[in-house]
Swiss-Prot record:
This is Structure-specific endonuclease subunit SLX1. Residues 359-396, 438-455 have a biased composition (Basic and acidic residues). It comes from the Eukaryota. It comes from Cryptococcus neoformans var. neoformans serotype D (strain JEC21 / ATCC MYA-565) (Filobasidiella neoformans). InterPro entries: GIY-YIG_endonuc, GIY-YIG_endonuc_sf, Slx1, SLX1_C, SLX1_endonuclease, Znf_RING/FYVE/PHD. Residues 44-69, 359-407, 433-475 are annotated as: Disordered. Residues 397-407 have a biased composition (Polar residues).
Length: 487
């Protein structure tokens, strides 16, 4: 292997979330603005990003671990506003960086009359004020590329919301008057060339990011009245009628055999690829089940766009911003269509995964049941074999087979049949007290008989042992007689 190959193999590689089918539309990812409440008039602020603002504010305030080191001082912190609706985590991180460093961002530049580009914001003493941070967020949302995204802004107090409203009234009114001078702008709050698009959702949520203030019912329209943290799982949209409900209805029609086609081109739709078609995502349009190819819908939105929103042929817009639904004729953001497509795809994949897991679980249970059944059958067969063996053994015992106690002359228990013995030596009653023991060879070669005498009743037990078991078969004799004790 060459050195170049080794370098290539050892090189750390990363996968983009935007390539190879890895991209997802996150349910929720927000950039947020914090303000320190350590003092009454504190101007310290902090900008960050997170998929879970209620948890993140607790981390910053030390209630949970993994808070930012720079916010460990000047606690407590209060969340002023969040910007969310980003189509990817990467887009949110780009917005966060530009919000933190507006004097370096290429997105926050404007062209003067001399065709020179100038930064709207400079690094001065007011760069961390709440007013400046709100103005930077407003400028980012009003300029490309973020003005093409389906973003939403949520405020958690009247003060920050009022700053936004005052900036909105000033934006687009003042024009940049510049010659060849490169003098820095004095007041960047007045240097915005255009205002935020009306389609951007502006929400005042007095319940706070954690929903514990008890003031949520005083909010503007568009905020849920019940208490609790903000919805970071996007359940209301993803599980609502506009996404899940309409797809279930379309699925029923597909299973019933209906031939569903694109509303615009009348061509067939590949319903197994959820990123190639769209269903009207408006929950308020209960009767609209308009299905279109995404490409057809994009062309339709571009063709139907107002004249003032169109660009010259030399600078065409690749993607539309919003348009009218071909069926219900209501305004829908392009980003809302894409968001619904990814939500639908995720739900279908989760359902398929759960179905596969359920089938695998059933198969595993069936396999275990089959093994248990086989084991039970084997156990029953074994019991039958043991029962037959017990019956055979009982029959042998009833025919004269007995079990003899262990002999004092033999190291192993002895089983003998009268007249046919496999033992080398057996004492008929070894528990009897012995007075005298005599042995002699009787009955032929290799057979030795011994007597055991009891003085109390004069009973003599006679045993025999075989010296060579392989050459002669032992013979057993029991004699009982009353006689005088041997002297």
């Amino acid at each position: 292997m060459s050195d170049d190959a080794e370098v290539t193999n050892n090189k750390k590689t990363t996968k983009s979330t935007l390539l190879d089918g890895n991209h997802i539309f996150p349910p929720f990812y927000a950039c947020y603005l914090l303000r320190s409440k350590a003092t009454a008039n504190s101007n310290r602020t902090y900008v960050g990003s997170t998929p879970d603002p209620p948890r993140r504010i607790r981390q910053h305030n030390g209630e949970l671990k993994q808070g930012a080191w720079s916010t460990s001082r000047h606690r407590p912190w209060e969340m002023q506003m969040i910007v969310y609706g980003f189509p990817s985590k990467l887009a949110a991180l780009q917005f966060e960086w530009a919000w933190q460093k507006p004097e370096l961002s290429r997105h926050l530049r404007i062209r003067g009359e001399d065709q020179e580009y100038y930064h709207i914001f400079t690094k001065d003493a007011r760069r961390n004020w709440v007013e400046r941070k709100v103005c930077v967020a407003y400028a980012l949302i009003s300029l490309t590329p973020f003005n093409r995204l389906p973003l939403h802004v949520r405020f958690f107090n009247h003060e920050t919301h009022g700053i936004w409203q005052s900036i909105h009234e000033q934006a687009g009114v003042n024009t940049i008057q510049r010659g060849k001078s490169r003098a820095k702008p004095v007041n960047p709050l007045h240097l915005l060339s255009q205002s935020v698009a009306p389609a951007v959702t502006i929400i005042l949520d007095l319940g706070g990011v954690s929903g514990t203030s008890g003031k949520r019912r005083e909010c503007t329209k568009g905020v849920m009245s019940h208490e609790g943290p903000i919805d970071v799982k996007d359940v209301e949209f993803r599980q609502g009628f506009g996404v899940r409900g309409k797809w279930l209805e379309i699925r029923k029609r597909i299973l019933s055999g209906q031939d569903l086609c694109c509303h615009l081109c009348q061509e067939r739709i590949a319903f197994n690829d959820h990123l190639t078609f769209s269903i009207c995502p408006l929950a308020e349009s209960q009767d609209c089940f308009c299905i279109t190819h995404l490409i057809c819908l994009a062309k339709h939105f571009q063709d139907e766009a107002p004249v003032e929103d169109r660009r010259a042929p030399s600078q065409p817009k690749i993607l539309p911003y919003q348009g009218l639904c071909p069926n219900c004729k209501r305004t829908v953001q392009w980003g809302q269509h894409i968001r619904a497509c990814y939500a639908r795809k995720e739900q279908v994949e989760k359902a398929e995964k759960a179905e596969k897991a359920e089938k695998a679980e059933k198969a595993e249970k069936a396999e275990k049941a089959e093994k248990a059944e086989k084991a039970e059958k084997a156990e029953k067969a074994g019991r039958k074999v043991r029962q037959r063996e017990m019956k055979t053994k009982k029959g042998d015992q009833s025919n004269g087979t007995v079990a003899q106690p262990e002999s004092i002359y033999s190291a192993t228990p002895v089983h003998t049949t009268f007249g046919l013995s496999n033992a080398s030596a057996t004492l008929i009653d070894p528990s009897m007290p012995a007075r005298s023991m005599k042995s002699k060879d009787v009955g032929g070669e290799g057979i030795r008989h011994s007597t055991h005498t009891d003085d109390s009743d004069g009973i003599i037990s006679v045993y025999s042992e075989t010296e060579d078991e392989s050459e002669s078969e032992p013979e057993w004799e029991i004699f009982e007689a009353e006689m005088m004790a041997l002297s």
